[in-house]
Amino acid sequence: MKIKEARMKTKEESLLATLAVLGIAALVAYLFPDHSLPAAGPRASSDSAMPLGKTLEPGRGRHAISPTGIPGKGWRDILWRTYDQINEDRLLAVAAGVVFYGLLALFPAITALVSSYALFADTKTVNDHISFLSEFLPSGTFSIVQDQVARVLSNGDMKLGTTFIASLLLAIWSANGGMKAIIDALNVVNDEKEKRGFFTLNAVSLAFTVGGVLATLTAIGFVVVVPILLSLVGLSSSTDLLIRIGRWPALAIMLLLGLAILYQLAPSRRPPKWRWISIGSAVATVTWMIGSGLLSFYLANFGHYDVTYGSLGAAIALMIWMWMSTIVVLFGAELNAEIEHQTAEDSTVGAAKPIGSRGATMADTIGASY
């Protein structure tokens, strides 16, 4: 027992050290950006430096009412601007900052997740079902999650009471910091300043935090519990196989919808219509699934971080996975922003408004041509 406690204490100290290193790196990247970057990106110059006639030249989808109405030249503009804005917005450094706050929010989020799940399931069931997360995390990093799950469950049976509710609310509030970091990053991508007040901003971020916990519980139930229930029904082998395979595309659709909701409602701006955020959401979903698989394969076969970093190896691998995931999410948002930036038509929800009065930088300006 003492050995296990010592091992868990060592991992906690290692993770704290990793957080400190990442925080310093993010601060340095923010204070000392690459001086080779342009002083002003295409967004800043598209309306002030380019004549309106040039900006609205035909054949580029300037009057498209959906992404499908944008021709090839327009998509070339979109891809070039997306590439430029990844540098202009210092996407990699911003993602590193999000990871720092995400790591601080990780343990409270796990606590909220496990505490909620433990209300309806025993300790063994919770451990078995939570283990499905190991299929998405890089090799060796799931042990960090496992240790925190064991720590929460070691407190005994969860019962709905004042103490439990207070602890759960505290955990959700702590995890809320990570969500606010994502919202801040999405504001950067959309060239927006936070205009919502303290209470409105926290209400939005808390809604996304609670929604994330509920979505994870739903995913666990869908991926783990549904096959168990189906096995009790006694379906034919072919039907059972089809359902077991089909749960993964269904999970991808859930992720796509979650990203679309995040892209639409998280930034401080008038929300875009669904059609303008669908492509970025789909690209981010597919890229994340492929990227997670490739990263897991690399870490399992080539990336032996425990040799280089010792006890920090698992934490470093987890950080890299979180960084990759954040970059993918922000890339999807960047792509959506530039798709919306291509048209002069109103891309926001509600009644159409003239350009300049739509309450969103990407809808109120027109992107540069290449």
Identify the meaning behind each predicted range.
Residues 2-370:
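Membrane-embedded alpha-helices and immediately adjacent juxtamembrane helical segments
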